[in-house]
Amino acid sequence: MNKAPQPTGPPPARSPGLPQPAFPPGQTAPVVFSTPQATQMNTPSQPRQGGFRSLQHFYPSRAQPPSSAASRVQSAAPARPGPAPHVYPAGSQVMMIPSQISYSASQGAYYIPGQGRSTYVVPTQQYPVQPGAPGFYPGASPTEFGTYAGAYYPAQGVQQFPASVAPAPVLMNQPPQIAPKRERKTIRIRDPNQGGKDITEEIMSGARTASTPTPPQTGGSLEPQPNGESPQVAVIIRPDDRSQGAAIGGRPGLPGPEHSPGTESQPSSPSPTPSPPPILEPGSESNLGVLSIPGDTMTTGMIPMSVEESTPISCETGEPYCLSPEPTLAEPILEVEVTLSKPIPESEFSSSPLQVSTALVPHKVETHEPNGVIPSEDLEPEVESSTEPAPPPLSPCASESLVPIAPTAQPEELLNGAPSPPAVDLSPVSEPEEQAKKVSSAALASILSPAPPVAPSDTSPAQEEEMEEDDDDEEGGEAESEKGGEDVPLDSTPVPAQLSQNLEVAAATQVAVSVPKRRRKIKELNKKEAVGDLLDAFKEVDPAVPEVENQPPTGSNPSPESEGSMVPTQPEETEETWDSKEDKIHNAENIQPGEQKYEYKSDQWKPLNLEEKKRYDREFLLGFQFIFASMQKPEGLPHITDVVLDKANKTPLRQLDPSRLPGINCGPDFTPSFANLGRPALSNRGPPRGGPGGELPRGPAGLGPRRSQQGPRKETRKIISSVIMTEDIKLNKAEKAWKPSSKRTAADKDRGEEDADGSKTQDLFRRVRSILNKLTPQMFQQLMKQVTQLAIDTEERLKGVIDLIFEKAISEPNFSVAYANMCRCLMALKVPTTEKPTVTVNFRKLLLNRCQKEFEKDKDDDEVFEKKQKEMDEAATAEERGRLKEELEEARDIARRRSLGNIKFIGELFKLKMLTEAIMHDCVVKLLKNHDEESLECLCRLLTTIGKDLDFAKAKPRMDQYFNQMEKIIKEKKTSSRIRFMLQDVLDLRQSNWVPRRGDQGPKTIDQIHKEAEMEEHREHIKVQQLMAKGSDKRRGGPPGPPINRGLPLVDDGGWNTVPISKGSRPIDTSRLTKITKPGSIDSNNQLFAPGGRLSWGKGSSGGSGAKPSDTASEATRPATLNRFSALQQTLPAENTDNRRVVQRSSLSRERGEKAGDRGDRLERSERGGDRGDRLDRARTPATKRSFSKEVEERSRERPSQPEGLRKAASLTEDRGRDPVKREATLPPVSPPKAALSVDEVEKKSKAIIEEYLHLNDMKEAVQCVQELASPSLLFIFVRLGIESTLERSTIAREHMGRLLHQLLCAGHLSTAQYYQGLYETLELAEDMEIDIPHVWLYLAELITPILQEDGVPMGELFREITKPLRPMGKATSLLLEILGLLCKSMGPKKVGMLWREAGLSWREFLAEGQDVGSFVAEKKVEYTLGEESEAPGQRTLAFEELRRQLEKLLKDGGSNQRVFDWIDANLNEQQIASNTLVRALMTTVCYSAIIFETPLRVDVQVLKVRARLLQKYLCDEQKELQALYALQALVVTLEQPANLLRMFFDALYDEDVVKEDAFYSWESSKDPAEQQGKGVALKSVTAFFNWLREAEDEESDHN
């Protein structure tokens, strides 16, 4: 708990010259500051508890409440006089109780002789005084009175304010401590001078001994307190020596500060209403010293009250309660103001009687500070006037004239609505004008009026807050109060019965009368309190209860009858706080003075001896074993079934009154109230527990009861509800539970727009994931169309799509090119932001932010790795350490892969111009600064990807710096060899002008994968044939030798198969045979095989082989092409040498672009083969580029007996195998560029330019690169490579390449001669290509057609030039027809015919001699080229698919039937209009537009009704109707035969009279094989329709 430790010490030393009582060990003598020397009392510390500080010493532990209530006198008993009091002997227990006493308005100053110290005493320093020293007042010494101090209650969650002025002390008998919250404690009073004799009975019965203090008695007030508690009575309290002495020496004749009741409205928790200052009347036999508190005010909830002080005069014991006249002393003014924000200095009250003038006029106490603190400057005059003589006090003794004194000390509990402290009234007459904001004294002298009534005190809630703000002033006031405190001794008087009754009531309600001075700085405590640091276990008061705040002050006019009745009234508030627990008041009424449950030892902590430590023996503690509190489960403990707490749920210990539960749920009471401990039952004990109105005491916010101060707990108490296992426990059901789509009802689907949007968003994400999973280079175009059709219209959806694409891109770096291209297509996508719909955010910005976030994620990854490394190092076992090590390695590997994937993706984005060079340079610099391996690896990946784009003339100095740094890293050898080699590879790549040694290992197309699979299967088949042929050869007994001599096709160059196999049982090792047939398995010097294999796939389908054959035999066993006609070779005789040579020769055509060195290596290897003679001659051909025609002629001469099919296949193989060999030629590093590039250099650079252009589609950069070649005479190589590299790629790639060539021609960088020369080399082989590429003419047309557009080559010139190499082969018209067809699609037949005629072209130029032009034109449908006939549109351009698209566009645009008629008449001739093609296209389009694409699919009959006239016009007979039904059948099959769709169409068509019955029957019985797809399912779906049709006919026939 947050209470300051206060050690218990021995009794204080005796002060010289003062009579001191003897105290038992552990009990500190009370102190009264009456010595001339201003000695501060320092009481040994003791453990603090909750409750009022001044009563702490007399409370037992909160965990030890009395088991039964002690009997006491009813609070309503009238006040009665007691026996004559006596002067306290030295050993009597006395205590100073600060109290606000009202006097007559005598303003005369008084002088107390012997008081030579300052008015104020420092509250924090207290010194022991030797007992027995002579004092100024007879029978009293400073040790007999506890210093008055504000108690610090760490257990109470209230605001505490510093005390600034010690109230006037009044010496009185030591009252028993009020029981803490919920405690039922019987207070025992023992006399230490009589050996600890219990004198409680004597005190409570009215008798007294010579050494026993007599407690005062207070009357109860019928007025309710602001917090709903009943008025409190004064209690007998032992002096608290910890607090500072109160100051004497007030200002005679000066009233206290004005303080009107309504001057302050406080928002905090209420305090009891202050009572008017009591007026002491003569008649007291003992001397009562009243101290005037000048200057600063107390800060424990007190409001300054002004009373006139009387100089204490020594009286003899036994005299009645009167004030002896003292002519030299003025009637003292008691000004006591206590607030709870700081410790309250404990004032001591003298036992000498007070002389109060009858002419006293009550003064209003006015608080000038917000918290009720009197400014220090106002206090100085009081100190100075304390020495003035006072008028003689009144001597008559009249207990009835005593005015009630409001309690002065009010602990923090009361500030939050706790019961007001008991007040001792010195007169039954109260002063109403002082009622509002005064707080009466917290203690009285024990010899005060026999029946002083109680007046409630009040400290409004706002005062508490304002008091907290004035801590500095209050502390200053404390210091001043030490200077002026003077002591007035008091004598004890007998205690009437009513006083004992009121005492018990006060004890039960736990109201402090004297609050000890706190020891720690109040500001610190207030700060802790503000944030809830102070013992939360006792914070049960809701500090902000509106009902309590607005409570008006009550109890200002208590009459004797009302004060004595002590009948609680119903409070207006709905919640009560801490010490206002009703059960305490209830039990306090039944406390008997002579009863006490627990017996305490003399040196043990007990209500009367709070100085001792809380030490208990075994027997004492075992007495609490089975009490109710011991059976309660503390807060915060784990659920243990053995705890008896659950019994409270099943058998409540008390009968619950619903009226007492206004803020909480009715149920078992788990309150660990200490007042309930040991109580047999609470259900039938008088009025309900609680204060007025029976309200249940609650903790903070009414959430639960307050807890003991013995241990901290949370502010709110958890109520554990009982669980009855027999009940049917219902589980919580989510309002929006997830359901599978198949089980979702219509209501679920219509659950609001937000759910609909969320569902649409998730559906969008699912579709994007599906598209990304399918994304391949081959599927890119069609998948991108799907992506562009997606509804990405919100920021959330856009971010989600970006995250999906990004995660996919970095997780699959091999596909980063495709993902980057997808991002490029979506770059312009913009959506409005969520916060500001008027502001848009685009795809590119969000994507770059995502890339940057991932790029800069390394710091977070490092932190995670360090944490995992630390966990691994701290692992206890080797097994755990191994597991953590695996996790760490896995995390690092994942982070590394993500970093590399992100770098690759960033590079691809840069290549697509989505990132700027500055960003990339920043990335390079950042990676280069970090010398860790991950960063360097990312750097190598990045430079490999984008180095070529960054390394241009302007950026060369910067790139040089990068590479110098990389060279330095390599030389330092501080990194691993793997990283150094990667860096070296990048350096080599730059030296080779960024031309890689190997091709880009991108993903393969599905067609390529299928072809490779077919090829592998074909290889295996050839192996089997070779083995079979070899086996048959051996059986013939032929001598082993080179296969060229025997015509076997399986011989390698190395001649391994020439080694004879011994006859016998030696088994054949098939694995070794497989190795023999594999290229490169024999020749150990085959260094060029691997590069060729790595590069072969990079050209896509045109690359073909996937491996570069290194010798002749490998070409025979594993063809380098994907020639699907290569299976024809298997049908030829194995002995046919020419067939073998055909396949071998294909490799030479691929080698023609090699350098001399590469060719020499190949020659050297070929010489080791059996047929090296033939290959040697052919391999020594010059290394110049030869025309394709010459090569074809040479091949034709070498193979005269070769079949035509194989010749074409071989020529195609040679052509397609050329590129891999050319790529091999790029392997050696290229020397720095020369003024004139060689053929090989131009070829290499041309390949790089073409690949880059096809990848980036950057026309401007490609033109610039071609210009930089500076070899205009060799640009035909660029043209040839451009055509070859795109011939088997996509249509878009060919169109792009054609546009690039057109741009080069228009810009003048490429001459027409160079263009034609490059085109010739390809066209010469076109005939051979047609075998492998049936659509080769269309593909060539797609490459050539862009040349004819916009300032290109004239049509006549182009057509005549491109047909030159094709006329001998008779293929000129094939290419021209494809070109004209493409031109008609873009320009229209009319314009194409006009261009043809303008160019002066004639078909006779291109046809073979003797071929009829007219028949050719009619057959090929190119009449538009013959003049007027071209006015009719060419029918070829409106084939079924094109016609369907045009009609679909018209219908989609909402065109009317007449518009469709007009379009058909304008674009189709009569033959096409009458054809089945139009009918099928029209039927398909109309029916498709009538489908409602929902689940399930439905037919929009209205659309068919509108379009019925359109269909009826062209479905003019049964045959046309049948064709229309066929088209409808095909459409339904395309849609995967949706249920009932065809039946709905049939019904609509029949109803609209579009199709007649005969046509339906004809369709049903049709056996046309071309229309049988899906016919069975379609017939089954319309069976009901035909049944109905037949029934309708039967009915019609019956009617007829």
Swiss-Prot record:
Gene Ontology annotations of biological process type: behavioral fear response; cellular response to nutrient levels; energy homeostasis; miRNA-mediated gene silencing by inhibition of translation; negative regulation of autophagy; neuron differentiation; positive regulation of cell growth; positive regulation of eukaryotic translation initiation factor 4F complex assembly
Region: EIF4E-binding, residue numbers: 611-622
Highest taxon listed in the record's lineage: Eukaryota
Membrane-crossing segments per the record: none
GO terms assigned for molecular function: ATP binding; eukaryotic initiation factor 4E binding; mRNA binding; translation factor activity, RNA binding; translation initiation factor activity
Region of interest: eIF3/EIF4A-binding: 686-1089
The MIF4G domain, residue ranges: 765-993
UniProt name for this protein: Eukaryotic translation initiation factor 4 gamma 1
Taxonomic lineage of the native organism: Eukaryota, Metazoa, Chordata, Craniata, Vertebrata
